[in-house]
């Protein structure tokens, strides 16, 4: 199937969605096609469709359609301007107006909030904006559009494990910012949301001893949920997970600690099957050549996922197989 066929398929599914907006199969199939497509011209309707797919949370992995979304977003005049200024090293001169423009791009902010964005140009631009923000903490006046963008940026950096390069100047500024927030909270006062979001774009908030003292306001609600509440819930859930045996091997312990500190891939939403099916139905769809047919007699399969990582595969498999018991194992 060439690119023209992909575009025709998308147009067909788009028409189906217009007739029946709640058509899950059309969204699912369109999501599969988006994985294969890079757009060469703007299309505002498709931006809305991608946004709708992301809103449904379980249609497809956000990262799988992020490249298609980015190829559409790059036709947006504000994003074109962002990339031009980033290339010319001019973001610092006008970053406030750039941020205001970007804050009004719902698809961009949605992508930033739920997945890594695999695009080197945008990565450099986001890194430059982040640096400009922390350099301006004592000068900038916060406003709703700025906080909206900052929240998306902090969520994005948390999801990508703070992979962006951090220079020595930023490290010093982060230390100052940490002290300001801690001192403010120690006085029984609340730090400005701008400062909290600025720090959250460089470091996760949950390890800080003062994290529980933050009042959850609309401006920082999403970031506090993702960076404080959910990690603490995860730690509580650890005690409920069954352990086969205690790990004594030093290397295995180090690998486990590494993945627990920086779970990869960190994910927010994932794609699931629309409905579970039996082995025989799956075999029919995949056209597998199985010699031993006895597997089709098993109506309640026990399935082992060895090396389940951060759980996406285990959850997906559980959504595929009808009446299955899943045992997911890892360090």
State where each predicted segment sits:
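Class I SAM-dependent methyltransferase "Motif I" SAM/SAH-binding loop
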Residues: 307-311
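Helical anchoring/docking segments at protein termini
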Residues: 304-306, 324
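Conserved SAM-binding motif I beta-strand of class I
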Residues: 325-330
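Alpha-helical solenoid repeat scaffolds of the TPR/TPR-like class and their adjacent stem/linker regions
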Residues: 1-303, 313-320
């Amino acid at each position: 199937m060439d690119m023209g066929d992909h575009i025709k398929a998308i147009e067909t599914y788009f028409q189906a969605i217009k007739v029946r907006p709640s058509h899950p199969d059309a969204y699912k199939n369109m999501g599969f096609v988006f994985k294969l497509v890079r757009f060469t011209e703007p299309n505002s309707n498709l931006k809305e469709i991608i946004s709708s797919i992301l809103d449904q949370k379980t249609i497809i992995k956000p990262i799988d359609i992020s490249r298609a979304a980015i190829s559409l977003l790059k036709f947006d005049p504000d994003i074109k301007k962002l990339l031009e200024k980033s290339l010319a090293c001019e973001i610092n001169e006008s970053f406030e107006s750039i941020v205001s423009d970007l804050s009004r791009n719902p698809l961009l902010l949605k992508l930033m909030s739920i997945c890594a964005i695999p695009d080197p140009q945008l990565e450099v631009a986001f890194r430059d904006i982040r640096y400009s923000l922390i350099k301006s903490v004592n000068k900038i006046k916060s406003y709703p559009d700025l906080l909206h963008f900052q929240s998306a940026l902090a969520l994005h950096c948390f999801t990508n494990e703070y992979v962006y390069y951090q220079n020595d100047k930023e490290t010093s500024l982060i230390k100052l910012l940490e002290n300001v927030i801690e001192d403010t909270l120690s006085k029984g006062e609340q730090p400005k949301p701008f400062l909290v979001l600025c720090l959250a774009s460089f470091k996760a908030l949950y390890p800080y001893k003062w994290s529980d003292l933050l009042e959850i306001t609309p401006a920082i609600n999403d970031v506090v949920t993702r960076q404080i509440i959910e990690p603490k819930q995860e730690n509580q859930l650890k005690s409920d997970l069954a352990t086969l045996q205690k790990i004594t091997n030093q290397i295995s312990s180090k690998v486990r600690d590494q993945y627990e500190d920086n779970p990869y891939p960190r994910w927010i939403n994932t794609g699931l099957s629309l409905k579970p099916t039996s082995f025989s139905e799956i075999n029919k769809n995949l056209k597998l050549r199985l010699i031993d047919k006895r597997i089709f007699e098993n109506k309640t399969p026990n399935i082992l996922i060895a090396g389940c990582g951060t759980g996406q595969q285990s959850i997906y498999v559980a959504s595929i197989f009808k009446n299955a018991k899943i045992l997911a194992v890892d360090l």
